[in-house]
């Protein structure tokens, strides 16, 4: 994942992630879908706040603002986010459609939350450590700034 974590193929053909931060979970139903998501998302941990998935409008807004921010950042560096991502997707023979990014994010969420969950336990008995799940209850400050909402507003929309 670029930071010491590992993606793993699970028995059912889905893809799991064991992150370097100790988060573990299923992240996609297939390698192609994972790559399509990552071409847009770049980083799975940017999409691990479970509250964004409780409201269709909230996840659509988050994804649109996320892509808008990526486009602005790339433009400042002198290149096109869309062209670079389209080229990358073409090299990997996968689809690239930023307009369907919210649907890809929702597929990630459904994979991450479907039973049975992919988990890891290290050790046994009282000394066992069970890793945190891939989805989080934390509403990060940068995500609040990105969507222009407070944590309270996001939580209210998630109900």
Language model region names:
Residues 1-159:
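A C-terminal-region feature
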């Amino acid at each position: 994942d670029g930071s010491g974590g590992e993606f793993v193929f699970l028995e059912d053909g889905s893809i799991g992630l064991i992150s370097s931060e100790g988060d573990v979970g299923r992240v996609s139903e297939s390698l192609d879908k994972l790559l399509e998501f990552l071409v847009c998302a770049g980083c799975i941990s940017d999409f691990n706040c479970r509250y964004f998935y409780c409201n269709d409008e909230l996840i659509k807004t988050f994804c649109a603002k996320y892509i808008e921010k990526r486009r602005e950042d790339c433009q400042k560096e002198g290149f096109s986010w869309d062209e670079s991502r389209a080229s990358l997707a073409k090299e990997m023979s996968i689809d690239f459609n930023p307009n369907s990014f919210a649907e890809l994010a929702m597929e990630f969420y459904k994979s991450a939350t479907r039973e049975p969950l992919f988990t890891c336990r290290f050790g046994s008995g009282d000394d066992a450590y069970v890793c945190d799940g891939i989805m989080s209850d934390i509403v990060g400050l940068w995500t609040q700034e990105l969507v222009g909402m407070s944590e309270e507003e996001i939580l209210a929309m998630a109900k």
